[in-house]
Structure formats: C-alpha cells, structure tokens
C-alpha cells in the first residue's frame, strides 16, 4: 500500500486505516508500485520515501514496513494486466513501473542511502526494512 493523503488511490490507505493497524500493533508496508506513489510523472525514490515520512509521523516507526511489488520474470500479459484495471493505476501518465532510483532489487542500497539522507537512524532503518514485520509475525505466530 501507500499513503492516500499523498496519492489518491482506492488501494492506498487512509489515515484512519493506518491508525487502526497501529492501534492493534500491526504494520503497514509501503509498496514500490509506482501508481500508488505518484500518478502525474514517474515517481522517484524521494517520492517513495515521502510516504514513509508521512506514515512514520502519523503512526510511528514501529508500524511502518518496507514492501515491494516486483515484476521479475513476468510475461507481456502480466505486465499489461495493470492497464486493464484503471481504478488501480488511477490515470498514470507515464510508461513503465518502478521508481527512478529504485527499479530493481540491485538498487536496494539506494533506499538505505535515501533513508540516511533523511536522518533515519540505523535502528529505524532496521525496523522499516524487516524488523517490524518480523515483530508482528512473532506476535501473531505464538
């Protein structure tokens, strides 16, 4: 998902939804699926990190998690599927998926670098890049 206050899309979460998840001790994952990050132009890594900043300010760093929608190994039909669902792509005005600066797994270090530039601590980055998700799994799978 991503933040609906930043990108108006029915698949993005509202502030109330994020608060409800946090109130139960859960975590929301910020996706790299570009139509959820920005629609008027190809989103950048900074646009992606803006969703983290907003969510962290609203519900705290313990309730936000790294998430991706990778398309490795997809066929032409799989790639075309999002365009059959305009309610999901919300009038995306650019070609391709992914973020400028973070298009593949190989560019994951760019995410960490971007977080460091925003003065995220090592402890926060650890939580965001899997620590929160693992915490929730441990709590749920007792």
Model-derived regions, located:
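Short, electropositive alpha-helical surface patch
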Residues: 44-57, 80-93, 141-142
């Amino acid at each position: 998902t991503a933040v609906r206050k930043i990108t108006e899309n029915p698949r993005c979460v509202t502030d109330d939804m994020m608060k409800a998840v946090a109130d139960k001790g859960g975590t929301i994952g910020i996706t790299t699926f570009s139509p959820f990050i920005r629609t008027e132009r190809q989103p950048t890594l900074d646009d992606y990190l803006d969703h983290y900043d907003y969510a962290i300010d609203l519900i705290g760093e313990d309730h936000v998690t790294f998430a991706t929608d990778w398309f490795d190994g997809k066929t032409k039909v799989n790639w075309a599927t999002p365009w059959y669902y305009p309610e999901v792509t919300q009038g995306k005005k650019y070609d391709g998926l992914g973020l400028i600066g973070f298009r593949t797994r190989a560019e994951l270090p760019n995410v960490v670098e971007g977080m460091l530039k925003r003065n995220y601590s090592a402890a926060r980055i650890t939580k965001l890049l899997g620590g929160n998700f693992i915490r929730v799994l441990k709590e749920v799978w007792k």
